[in-house]
Amino acid sequence: SAASDVYKRQIDRVNVVVRERLLAEMPLEESARLCVIGDVRSFNNRRGPGAKLVITVFARDISLSDEPYDRNLILLSGTLCKPPNLRTTPMGRDICDLMLAVNRHYGRSDYLPCITWGARACETALWDVGTRVSLEGRLQSRSYIKVLDTGAVERTAFEVSVLDICRLSAPDD
């Protein structure tokens, strides 16, 4: 499909955390093609000025890959924990920012910024905090310029670019 072709062309830099045991089992070389299966994690890094949400992939399995193209696929289910924010890009495209809380073991949750596009953006903008959703997308990285009192600084944002999303339940269900 055209949407999956876009995913094949986009280059994203993703931070991966790997246990030493997994690395010891497989010698890595720079620019090696890898298959990483794992969980997306988030935490607030409070060091330095301003809070910064850090998004990583915690590798459960890692292996060398002989696939002819890279595949960046994420499947999530969780709960909207902030009101959706519908906006228009400078190119005139509708996008909606969502914050998804994804529960994991031991009462912890990961908070993952997600973006829907076009007609889906307009639809998801109407959803309420507490709505349960399931989605498919990719973990994307994008550069942006942050203007500070001391000048402009280039930063990288990590977010889930949503390909498909469905509402599992509304807050009052």
Model-derived regions: residue spans:
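Short, small-residue-biased leader/transition segments that mark boundaries at the very start
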Residues: 2-7
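A beta-strand/beta-hairpin structural motif
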Residues: 9-27, 106-126
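A generic structural signal for short beta-strands and their flanking turns/coil linkers
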Residues: 12-14, 30-34, 51-53, 72-76, ...
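OB-fold single-stranded nucleic acid-binding module
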Residues: 24-26, 39-63, 84-91, 125, ...
